[in-house]
């Protein structure tokens, strides 16, 4: 598992809030750093896949365990 440089707790938030919060958090990172997001919205799976494609950031990991969805996104650039 990759270590995250920043964590975002998006549990209990519904679309589009997890993506909006992730976008804000990613903007605070330097290129190459990793954001770990924990969400409970099942729709976030497709949202984060699309978010990564649109922004050029790399979705390193997408897992689901006990109703929680965990994403690791590496900021593009650098």
Description of each model-found segment:
Residues 11, 40, 74-76:
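Generic beta-structure capping elements
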Residues 49-78:
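C-terminal structural segments of small proteins and small subunits
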Residues 16-60:
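Amphipathic, hydrophobic secondary-structure cores in small proteins
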